[in-house]
UniProtKB/Swiss-Prot annotation:
GO CC aspect terms: plasma membrane; proton-transporting ATP synthase complex
Protein name, as recorded: ATP synthase subunit delta
GO molecular function, a single term: proton-transporting ATP synthase activity, rotational mechanism
Lineage: Bacteria, Bacillati, Actinomycetota, Actinomycetes, Micrococcales
PROSITE patterns: ATPASE_DELTA (PS00389)
Source species: Leifsonia xyli subsp. xyli (strain CTCB07)
Length: 263
């Protein structure tokens, strides 16, 4: 992420915070729809990401193209358009992120959106037929969205369904699981949390998982555990928190031992 984008992103997130309760699920749906329009228009994408373009002109363009959307969504799109971004994809990232954050900010505290997103990502990865159906470039995006709704409506929160539907409608080169992980990270960040992905050969007992969470939280702050079972690591565990990886898996230790013996 370039420095310009990093600063623009921070200001955009701050603008969202300034809206308070005005930003909600409806705002997110409008932002997602706007993001798809921007993604489909080379000209619009180029103008909105052009640092040399007149800022007031961009604002007029946003209101002309997206004026029918809710006022909070139009305001946030205006903020994004007025910022300086490192590239066109960063504009799309920002629109999607503010949509996801709008959902997270307005969701009831009883709804665990990251857990539901990550659980669905795991289900997709473990079902080759489902993964193919959702990642196929030949499949109609609206059919993918309908499939997501059939699978999740009534089983997951409406907020989770909305985010997942957006990700399959506009994958932008990401795998379903990759997109869901990033969305879960954004939701957690909106709530002031970090996600720690813990890979073990067998499921961790609840008490052990809580001790691990508390231990990691002492160093990394408030966090949520994303538990992944992968028998191929043989034993031990591998923990990833952002860019930090703590690999204590048996498979990793065996690999290092083989390298030492070969040397």
């Amino acid at each position: 992420m370039g420095s310009a984008t990093r600063e623009a992103r921070a200001r955009s997130v701050s603008a969202l915070a300034g809206l308070g309760s005005k930003a909600d699920l409806a705002t997110a749906e409008d932002l997602f729809a706007a993001g798809r329009v921007v993604a489909d228009s080379v000209q619009l994408r180029a103008v909105l990401s052009d640092p040399a373009a007149d800022r007031s002109g961009k604002d007029v363009l946003v209101k002309r193209v997206f004026g029918a959307l809710s006022a909070p969504a139009v305001e946030l799109l205006g903020v994004i358009a007025g910022e300086r971004w490192s590239g066109q994809d960063d504009v799309l990232d920002a629109i999607e992120e503010l949509g996801i954050r709008s959902i997270a900010a307005s969701a009831p505290r009883t709804v665990d959106i990251p857990a539901e997103l990550l659980a669905f990502g795991g289900a997709v990865t473990s079902d080759a037929e489902l993964e193919l159906a959702l990642r196929s470039k030949l499949a109609d995006p609206s059919a993918k969205a309908a499939l997501v709704e059939r699978l999740l409506v009534g089983k997951a929160a409406g907020q989770t369904v909305a985010i997942t539907r957006q990700l399959v409608l506009q994958p932008r080169g990401r795998s379903v699981r990759q997109a869901l992980r990033e969305a879960a990270r954004i939701v957690a960040a909106q709530d002031g949390q970090t996600i720690a992905t813990v890979v073990t050969a067998t499921p961790l007992p609840a008490a052990q998982a809580e001790r691990l969470r508390a231990s990691l939280a002492a160093k990394y702050g408030d966090l949520k555990l994303n538990q992944v079972v992968d028998p191929s690591i043989l034993g031990g565990m591998r923990v990833q928190i952002g860019g930090d990886v703590i690999d204590g898996s048996v498979s990793s230790r065996l690999s290092k031992l083989r390298l030492q013996l070969a040397g």
